[in-house]
Amino acid sequence: MSLTCLASNTKEDLNVFIITGNFLKINSGYVAFNKKEIDFLEKIIKIYNPNNRITLLDMSCLEDELMNSTNKNTKFTPYTLLRLYIDDEVFSSIDNRLLYMDIDTMCFGDIKELYNFDLKGKTLGMVRDNVGRHWIHKNYCNAGMILFDVDKTIANKDKIIKAREMIRTVKMFMPDQTAINRAFKDDIEFLPSKYNEQNKMEKDTLVRHYCGVLKFFPYMHIIKVKPWDDDIEKFHKQRKEHVMDKSIEITNEFVRQYKNNEEPYLIK
């Protein structure tokens, strides 16, 4: 769903990296994407632009390291940590920028605007976290969307290593996000909220992030429902949005096509 939103709104060629891994020692449900699935996803995004492509980054080799992490038993899966293990070979193969996006981020415009944002000499571009900026620190950022300056990321590899070490040894709330905030303190350019809108759709929202949202009325609770959940009415009721309805319909049709071993095609 995130990929179709991205591909349908972006005119430029997309070079997509999907990070995955088998972590069955941690949880029997932590199964990597396979080649058949990736090939099907690539066919989907090529519907929008034949030059779009996908590369699979399988990080199953990290299982033992993640098993020994102090943060392995948090509510966050090991997949949230993998953005910190993208290696130099990948960064070196990319010109200028790498845009990381969580699977629950949806684009509502051409991503070129965000990709070309001026980072003013900083290594990372991030949006402040909707909850953490009030409860943790005013400049605490959300890691669901990270814009990397590739050259500076390679030059500042020590900060990546520092973040990995913190995840391995220091118990943290939201470990991946907190480690990034600490390791890259003073090296993050704060981006406008429209590039990672965590609360609700606004008129200028470019990237909507359907992460957990803390609500206080009628009682304190967290909204966790995602666009791909089976109960669409629950999504409408809790998120109070219908902007994803067409994308949900398109995605459900692609899922049906995949299950029936059909070639993907776009419904009207």
Regions found by a protein language model. Give the residues of each.
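Active-site-proximal specificity loops/subdomain of glycosyltransferases
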Residues: 24-25, 30-89
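A short acidic, often aromatic-flanked loop/helix-cap motif at beta-alpha or helix-coil junctions
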Residues: 59-68, 132-133, 196-200
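Histidine-anchored nucleotide/phosphate-binding helix
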Residues: 1-11
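A glycosyltransferase accessory/donor-loop signature
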Residues: 10-12, 148-268
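Short Gly/Pro-enriched turn/cap motifs at secondary-structure boundaries
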Residues: 75-76, 135-138, 169-172
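Short internal beta-strands
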Residues: 15-22, 126
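Residues at the starts of beta-strands that form the adenosine-phosphate
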Residues: 13-16, 53, 97
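GT-A fold catalytic core of metal-dependent nucleotide-sugar glycosyltransferases
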Residues: 56-62, 79-130, 138-140, 145-148
